């Protein structure tokens, strides 16, 4: 006799037992109860054909189902633990830098997906650094909390923030938003730098030197900035 035939019968017996307990609590509707009665007759016929006791088969079916559920629970638990252990928060900005109010002389605002990009177009010929606080999971940017653009003097001149009304964004969304902000700031001949932490997680591909690859114009700006610092 095929072992799959027996184990299938055992599982069917246990599942019928669960459905019967459900019906005993007067929770089943008419179609449910009708199927229950028909399945009971079917199980009795199969038990006779297989020469298997229904009560014994029900207990064996319970063990099979419990093993399956235990395995699924263990795998789900392992994935949950792995996710929690892999989740971490990275902070370029202090609490003061995150909470500080700022004003724009020539405000420009753009919405890209679920992210809002704001910048001051009055800023010219400045060296600007982008800093961000965000969460990372499995070495990928998961959620942007806040990104701000600072001048060397510490003034805030740009910002990217999630829109509360449109929750959820990907690392690609953040990358695109950063590109928009950089492009807007560079338009007025500002030199834009990106924090090392943000570079690592906002751009996943790397150049030959192991640094995250940036758009060509951004590469030129960063090269000039590096030369001036040496």
From Swiss-Prot:
Residue ranges, annotated region (CPSF4-binding): 180-215
Region named RNA-binding and homodimerization: 1-73
Start and end residues of each stretch annotated as Disordered: 205-230
Stretches the record annotates as PABPN1-binding: 223-230
Function description: Inhibits post-transcriptional processing of cellular pre-mRNA, by binding and inhibiting two cellular proteins that are required for the 3'-end processing of cellular pre-mRNAs: the 30 kDa cleavage and polyadenylation specificity factor/CPSF4 and the poly(A)-binding protein 2/PABPN1. In turn, unprocessed 3' end pre-mRNAs accumulate in the host nucleus and are no longer exported to the cytoplasm. Cellular protein synthesis is thereby shut off very early after virus infection.
Keyword check for Mitochondrion: no
Disulfide bonds: none
Record GO cellular component, one term: host cell nucleus
GO biological process: symbiont-mediated suppression of host cytoplasmic pattern recognition receptor signaling pathway via inhibition of RIG-I activity; symbiont-mediated suppression of host gene expression; symbiont-mediated suppression of host mRNA processing; symbiont-mediated suppression of host PKR/eIFalpha signaling; symbiont-mediated suppression of host type I interferon-mediated signaling pathway
Assembly notes: Homodimer. Interacts with host TRIM25 (via coiled coil); this interaction specifically inhibits TRIM25 multimerization and TRIM25-mediated RIGI CARD ubiquitination. Interacts with human EIF2AK2/PKR, CPSF4, IVNS1ABP and PABPN1.
Keyword vocabulary terms for this entry: Eukaryotic host gene expression shutoff by virus, Host cytoplasm, Host gene expression shutoff by virus, Host mRNA suppression by virus, Host nucleus, Host-virus interaction, Inhibition of host innate immune response by virus, Inhibition of host interferon signaling pathway by virus, Inhibition of host PKR by virus, Inhibition of host pre-mRNA processing by virus, Inhibition of host RIG-I by virus, Inhibition of host RLR pathway by virus, Interferon antiviral system evasion, RNA-binding, Ubl conjugation, Viral immunoevasion
Subcellular location: Host nucleus; Host cytoplasm
Gene that encodes the chain: NS
Domain of life of the source: Viruses
Signal peptide start-end: none
Gene Ontology terms, MF aspect: protein serine/threonine kinase inhibitor activity; RNA binding
Motif Nuclear localization signal: where in chain: 34-38
Main location: host cell
Protein name as catalogued: Non-structural protein 1
Family per similarity comment: Belongs to the influenza A viruses NS1 family.
Domain notes per entry: The dsRNA-binding region is required for suppression of RNA silencing.
InterPro entries xref list: NS1 (IPR004208), NS1A (IPR000256), NS1A_effect_dom-like_sf (IPR038064), uS15_NS1_RNA-bd_sf (IPR009068)
């Amino acid at each position: 006799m095929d072992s799959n035939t027996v184990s299938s019968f055992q599982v069917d017996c246990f599942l019928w037992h669960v459905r019967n307990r459900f019906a005993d609590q007067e929770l089943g509707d008419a179609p449910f109860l009708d199927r229950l009665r028909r399945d009971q007759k079917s199980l009795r016929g199969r038990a006779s054909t297989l020469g298997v006791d229904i009560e014994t088969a029900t207990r064996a079916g319970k063990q099979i189902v419990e093993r399956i559920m235990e395995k699924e629970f263990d795998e789900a638990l392992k994935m949950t633990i792995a996710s929690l252990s892999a989740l971490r928060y990275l902070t370029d900005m202090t609490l003061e830098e995150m909470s500080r109010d700022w004003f724009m002389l020539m405000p420009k605002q753009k919405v890209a997906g679920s992210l809002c990009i704001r910048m001051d177009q009055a800023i010219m010929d400045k060296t600007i650094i982008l800093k961000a606080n965000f969460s990372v999971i499995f070495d990928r940017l998961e959620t942007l909390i806040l990104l701000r653009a600072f001048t060397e003097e510490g003034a805030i001149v740009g910002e990217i923030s999630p829109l509360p009304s449109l929750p959820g964004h990907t690392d690609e969304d953040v990358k695109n938003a950063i590109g928009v902000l950089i492009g807007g700031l560079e338009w007025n001949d500002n030199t834009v730098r990106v924090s090392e932490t943000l570079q690592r997680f906002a751009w996943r591909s790397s150049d030959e030197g192991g640094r995250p690859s940036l758009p060509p114009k951004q590469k030129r700006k960063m090269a000039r900035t590096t030369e001036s610092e040496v």
